[in-house]
Structures are given as C-alpha cells and as structure tokens.
Curated annotation (Swiss-Prot):
Belongs to the glycosyltransferase 1 family. SUPFAM superfamilies: UDP-Glycosyltransferase/glycogen phosphorylase. Residues 259-738 are annotated as: GT-B glycosyltransferase. This is Sucrose synthase. It comes from the Bacteria. It comes from Melioribacter roseus (strain JCM 17771 / P3M-2). The lineage of its organism: Bacteria, Pseudomonadati, Ignavibacteriota, Ignavibacteria, Ignavibacteriales. One of its GO terms (molecular function) is sucrose synthase activity. Optimum pH is 7.0.
Length: 793
C-alpha cells in the first residue's frame, strides 16, 4: 500500500491530479473522507488501486483557487498537511497552523487577523511521552520506567523526592509510613537494614501490633503492612528503590502506600441520583458508571488499607448540582448516602441564584457553563466541611465535571484525574469551525475551551478504549481531535494535545454483576420484576407512556435502550426496521428511549427526535409491530429487560453515531444477548466482530439491515448460531471487563501520578500559568455573555 503522497502522485500521476481537480470544482469547498470516496467512485476510478487506499487516508480537503489543501492521516495519531498546486503539479508540506488558516479563509475570512493562536507543544516537549503507537494509553508503564531511570541519573535528587514523599503521608497528624526518628535518605537506608534484621526473627504472619514498638523505635509506622511478611516485602521494595531503582519495584511500592483516603468525584450536569433519574435530560450511562465506580473504589480502598495495617474507613463524595425543582427525584436533597456503600455519599451544591427562573430548574449540559466557577468555589467549602480536610484525589467527569475538577484540584493542590466519557467535538461535524453558527444551541466556545483546560491540566486521564485517545488507522480519536482545530474569531489551536503523553491510560469499566447477569441464572431473577417487564413489552396493555402494540408478540424481539438524542441515532434503527419486509415478517421492535410526548421534555434535541420517531412510525405503518416505551426503567428492571429479550432469543442493537464507551453494550452482552453495535467508538474494541457480536455502520442502512437479517435467518435455521454468540458475549465481558480490576488500577494510577506531581511540581508552573490565562481571558468572557442571556429569560 502506498502511503507516501509523493510516491502516490508519481505512480498515479494523471488520476491523482484529475481527481483533485474534480474535488476543486465541487460546490463544497470543504470535503471529508466519505464525500471524497463517494466522488472517487462516482468518477469511475478503480477501487482496487493504491490511489483509492490513499484517498481513504485523506481526512479533509480545502479547495482554494488553483490549489487543494489536504489533511492526510499517515498512521494512527500522525497527521500531515499538504498544499497541492493544480497548475504546476507541486506538492508542498505545510504546518498545522497554515492548514487552519486556510480553513478560516473558507469559513470566516474576516477573522484571520483577530484569531488568537494557542500552542501547547512547548509544554509537551518537556514531558515524557511514549514512542510507539501500541503503547498509547499505557502511559503509567512508560512513566514508571522514566521515573526509575531518573532515580539512576539524578540519584540524590530523586532519593530525596522519594523520602520526602513517603514522610508526607499522615492521617489526622499521625504518620503512616515514617516518623521523625529517620532524618534523611542515608539514615533511612541504615534503618531499613536494621528493621529487616529484626523482622527476620518473626514469623511472616506476626501481626503489626506485636512488633510495632520495634518498628517505631527504628522510625517505621503502621502503614507499611498488616503483618511481618507484608512489612518485610515493602521494606525490601523500598531498599531496592534507594539502591538499585527498578520500574516494577517503583510501581509496586508506590501502589502500596496508604496515601488515598478521601476521593471527590465531580459530575455537575443532569439529574444525579440513585432512583428515577435515568432517561431524564442529560442523565444516562455516566450516572450508572459513577455509582458502580464508587462502590468498587470504596471496596478496593478498604481492602488496601487493611493490607497496609490501617483500620481506617475511607470516604468518597460524588459532587453534583442540587436542583431545587427536582421533578420528583432526590436531586433537591443536599446529602444522600450511596446504596450498598459504607461511607460514600452524593453531595449536592446548588448553583448561585442569579435568575431563579433558570437556576431553580434543570439546565442543559450545553448551558451550564456560567455557573461552574461559583459552583467550584462553593463546593470547595462544602467538601472541606464533609471531609474535614482536603481530598486526596479529585476525579472529573465529562467536560463540566473536568472543568470543576481543574478549579478544585488547583485550589486544593491535589492530584487531578479526568474522565471524558464523551467529547462533543468529535460528535458534531465542523462544530469548531462553525462554532458561531451553533453557539445559540450548543455553546461550544465554552465547552471546547473547558476540554482544552481539563486535558492539559489533568495529572492523568482515564479512557475506556484506545480509539478514544488516538482513533484507528482511518479515523481520528476523540482526544486526538483536539490536536489541531480552529474556532475562527475566537482562537486556533496549533497543537492542543499529545496522544503519546504519559498521562493517558486505558482503564475499561465493568458492569454491576448484581443487576446485569446471564439470563440462564434463573435463581437470581425476581419473578415479579420479570412479570412486570414482560407485561410492559409484550402484553399490549394500554399505557400512556407507550406507543404501539404487537400483533404477534411471539416474533423475535429486536431491542434497543438509550437516551433519545441525535447521537444515539434510534431513528436509524426504526428506518432499518421500517424499510425491511424481512425484519417485519420475523421480528418486533422494542424501543426504550426518552419520552413519547415532546411537551414532556425541555431538551430540544429530544423534542426533535420524538417528532421524528412519530413520523417514522406513521410513515412505515409500524404501530402494530413496535413497542416504543417512553419512560424510565429502574436499574433492576433494565437488567431483567435484557434477560427477557435474551430468553426470547432476540438481539440488542446499539446504533449510535458515536459511543464513547458503551455500557449498554456490556450490559446486553453479559446478559447473553447477541449485540449489534456501532463501529464508531468504544464498541469497536468491546466487540470482536463475528465472534461475540457484530459491528455496524450507523449511517449504512442497507448493510446494517443485511447483517441483522442474515444473523436472524441463520439462527432460525440453526439454533446453535444464536447460542454460540450468546455464550461468547458472556465470556468476553466476564474475562475483560471488571470493576474490581478497574478500581485496583485506578487507585494505583492515582498514587503513581501523585508521586510524579509531587516530584515535578515546579516544572508545571509554566503550563499552569498558560491555562490560567486561557481560563480568564477566553472561558470567563464567553461564560459572562451566556449568563447575560440567562438573566433575560
């Protein structure tokens, strides 16, 4: 395959330049990959040639007078830009800044001289980065090697860093690792040897309490382990780090330090609660993710503290917004204990009032921005009151939560972790370039700025998949989309992120095994819940929240469940079903999504999708073949819903235009349902195509319908086809996706990046000043404009 543009132009000279001339004559001055491929095929060029393979690598073209500008994806996380003269047949590589200026020339030429240029590359050049593509998302492994090598090359400095770091940790003034009897690193070395000699006289299972006076006399406290064996192991690791540093020893020792007791998890938008919230505006998988995450983290913290010899109860607080008019939920209660947890809580802090007609109600995640600075300020005080001290770790979620995490971590001076869940920039075509036209709906000027601030301020970033960071050979990753972009008249980003940076780590979540489990486990299933869901789905009983009935409820159910918005793309599945006689003959469509009455929602995207759903059901005459359920299913009922569909040998379809990860995909698979899910986003890595599920193209209706029809047809002929895929789906989730593994890894990351932050704190002052400037001059000025609009409502 020819990847090099110069060789491509040489090998396919006539076709190459003829095609680019065809591009330059199109009405659209900006074209993307799919449009270029369609033009290539429509123009009669050979799809089997090396030229076609090169065209697939072009992400975008800009047509100007007598030239075409190309954005070419050389490989994963590597892009080059070219200007091609169609008069002189010249190819010239250009910079990202030049490419962005060309885009501005087409989109908004009057802003060329007023657009601020941002460039984070000088800061990234000072930081460690992985070199090989396959290690993207494994930042901590490279960081461990980097830190251990630094301990060799700058021995005295890093020994002191390590010594000061472990002396730092205490609980309520009581030292956890070292006490003041140990004065410096040389003394520490001697005392380790003395302690190891003393410990050698005691059996490995000797409790700490029996030997604590010996250890304390030597300068060691109880946080090194619960018994002589654990303490001996950890002291040997510390001895190795001081004398012969090794990346494995560094990771294991730092991970064993009891340095995290209090965690703040930030998620302001939507209705964050435990009951009756899923399906409300801006409320979905993120809430499920965080609640499951909290329980797993708390359990792991308790276990690790016990192993360290500490009988302490950690505390986790999920910080969210208090909504006065909470629509019958608990979202107007200040404090709520998390079910099944020992000391984990939801803390709700209200937005400051300003205009009560706005701030007493739910506020869209796209309009939340003017209130977040005050929210962070008030939350700082509230968190201090609850924890009685600063938290040890702050985890931000989504753009708004990550912005608040940035503000809080800066004020608390603690480790900041970011979890994007989904970055809106990659969902909406040209959302940055035409930001001004979209501003009244989405306010991307603030959201993309918040993302830039969060990405570049976080000590480490958690992603659920590789593609979330760096995409694929053919498509750009969510984070990668922040490398180069322009918002004409506001700012252009010449270099916004480095996907190779060590802050990126892939840590995939799991599912709540008490709620989502395989359908054959009948003893675990509640008969009343099963009866209720079967009645809702298949009985044709009248319900004001349900559209449609099933003439033949025994047909194979095709099931989908999600929020009802443009990105979730439920209407695509309805079209597939509505235009396929084969599917309608053999199957029914069961949709659990949103509301069925547009007057029952304030979300304008949901309103549009509700209208579209009604239009499609009427157009395709589906009223007797569909059950569209427009109400919330509690978590226990959603788990049973998957199992009931599996019991009837149905399938689950997730047709999103883009899915950051895909919790519903995991939930369906672990229930034993064959899954057809979007190939854009997390499901591309969750599902092994054809082995334990199927990838679908959410814009290719014919191909998607054909895949579903073929699988259902094969399953009717041979029941083992369905059985095999069902078992493989369960196996995939069981082996790969676990909250236990997730929580253990996240806490280990938090400790290692905490050490790195401590050891290199002064080196971050320059980027922090840059971020502060962006926040105050760009973000706050845009937020002020939106607040003024809200005050007029």
């Amino acid at each position: 395959m020819i990847k090099d543009i110069y060789k491509t132009a040489e090998t396919f000279h006539n076709d190459f330049y003829d095609f680019l001339k065809a591009v330059s004559t199109q009405p659209k001055k900006l074209m993307i990959t799919g449009e270029l491929i369609n033009l290539y095929v429509a123009s009669g060029y050979d799809k089997n040639s090396g030229l076609y393979e090169f065209i697939e690598k072009i992400q975008e073209t800009i047509s100007l007078d007598h030239s075409v500008i190309l954005d070419v994806r050389i490989k994963i996380a590597s892009i080059k830009f070219y200007r091609i003269s169609l008069e002189e047949f010249l190819i010239e590589e250009i910079s990202s800044k030049e490419f962005l200026i060309y885009k501005e020339t087409v989109a908004k030429p009057d802003t060329l001289n007023t657009t601020l240029n941002l460039n984070f590359k000088p800061f990234y050049d000072k930081s460690p980065a992985v070199r090989d593509i396959k290690y993207i998302g494994s930042g901590v492994e490279y960081l461990n090697r980097f830190l251990s090598s630094q301990m060799f090359t700058n021995e005295e400095r890093w020994k002191k860093n390590l010594f000061d770091f472990i002396r730092l940790h205490n609980f309520n003034g009581e030292q956890l690792i070292l006490n003041d009897r140990i004065k410096d690193t040389k003394h520490l070395n001697n005392q380790i040897n003395a302690a190891l000699a003393k410990l050698g006289n005691h059996p490995a299972n000797t409790p700490y309490e029996n030997i604590k006076h010996i250890l304390q006399e030597l300068g060691f406290e109880k946080g090194l382990g619960k018994d002589a064996g654990t303490i001996t192991h950890n002291l040997n690791l510390l001895d190795q780090l001081l004398n012969s540093p090794d990346h494995n020893a560094l990771a294991e020792f730092i991970s064993s330090i009891p340095m995290i007791l209090n965690i703040a998890i930030i998620s302001p938008h939507g209705f964050f609660g435990q009951e009756g919230v899923l399906g409300l505006p801006d409320t979905g998988g993120q809430v499920v993710y965080i609640l499951d995450q909290v329980k797993a983290l708390e359990k792991q913290l308790i276990d690790s503290l016990k192993k360290s010899g500490l009988n302490l109860l950690p505390k986790i607080i999920v910080l969210t917004r208090l909504i006065p008019n909470a629509r019958g939920t608990t979202c107007n209660q200040r404090l709520e204990k998390i079910y099944g947890a020992k000391n984990s809580w939801i803390l709700r802090v209200p937005f400051r009032e300003y205009n009560k007609r706005v701030t007493d109600e739910w506020i869209s995640r796209f309009e939340i921005w003017p209130y977040l600075e005050d929210f962070a300020e008030d939350s700082y005080t509230a968190l201090l009151a609850e924890f009685k001290k600063r938290p040890d770790l702050i985890i931000g979620n989504y753009s708004d939560g990550n912005l608040v995490a940035y503000l809080l971590a800066k004020k608390f001076k603690v480790t900041q972790c970011g979890i994007a869940h989904a970055l809106e920039k990659s969902k909406y075509l040209y959302s940055a370039l035409y930001w001004y036209d979209l501003e009244k709906y989405y306010h991307f000027s603030m959201q993309f700025t918040a993302d830039l601030l969060a990405i570049n301020s976080a000590d480490f970033l958690i992603t659920s998949s590789f593609q979330e960071i760096a995409g694929t050979e053919k498509s750009i990753g969510q984070y990668e989309s922040y490398m180069h972009f322009t918002m004409p008249g506001l700012y252009r980003v010449e270099n916004g992120v480095n996907p190779f940076h060590v802050k990126f780590n892939i840590v995939s979540p799991g599912v709540n095994e008490k709620i989502y489990f395989p359908y054959p486990k009948t003893k675990w299933r509640l008969k009343e819940t099963k009866r209720r869901i079967e009645n809702l789905f298949f009985s044709n009983s009248e319900d004001p929240d349900v559209i449609g009935w099933l003439d033949n409820p025994e047909k194979t159910p095709i099931f989908t469940m999600s929020r009802l918005d443009r990105i979730k793309n439920i209407s695509f599945l309805v079209r597939c079903f509505g235009e396929s006689e084969e599917l309608q003959q053999t199957s029914n469509l069961i949709v659990v999504a949103g509301k069925i009455d547009e007057t029952m929602t304030d979300d304008y995207e949901e309103k549009e999708q509700i209208r579209l759903m009604h239009e499609l059901i009427t157009k395709y005459k589906l009223h007797n073949k569909i059950r569209w359920i427009g109400k919330l299913l509690p978590k226990d009922e959603s788990g049973e819903a998957y199992r009931i569909i599996a019991e009837r040998r149905g399938i689950f379809v997730q047709p999103a235009l883009f899915e950051g990860f895909g919790l519903t995909v995991l939930e369906a698979m672990t229930s034993g349902l064959p899954v057809f899910a979007t190939k854009y986003g997390g499901p591309l890595e969750i599902i092994q195509n054809g082995v334990n599920g199927f990838h679908i193209d959410p814009v290719n209706q014919e191909e998607t319908t054909e895949k579903i029809v073929r699988f259902l047809s094969d399953s009717y002929i041979d029941s083992s086809v369905w059985d095999k895929l069902s078992k493989a789906a369960i196996k995939r989730v069981t082996e790969k996706y676990s909250w236990k593994l997730y929580s253990k890894r996240l806490l280990s990351l938090a400790k290692l990046y905490g050490f790195w932050k401590y050891a290199t704190n002064l080196e971050h002052e320059d980027i922090n000043a840059y971020l502060d400037l962006i926040y105050h001059t760009i973000y706050k000025s845009r937020a002020k404009i939106l607040l003024e609009e809200h005050m007029k409502r």
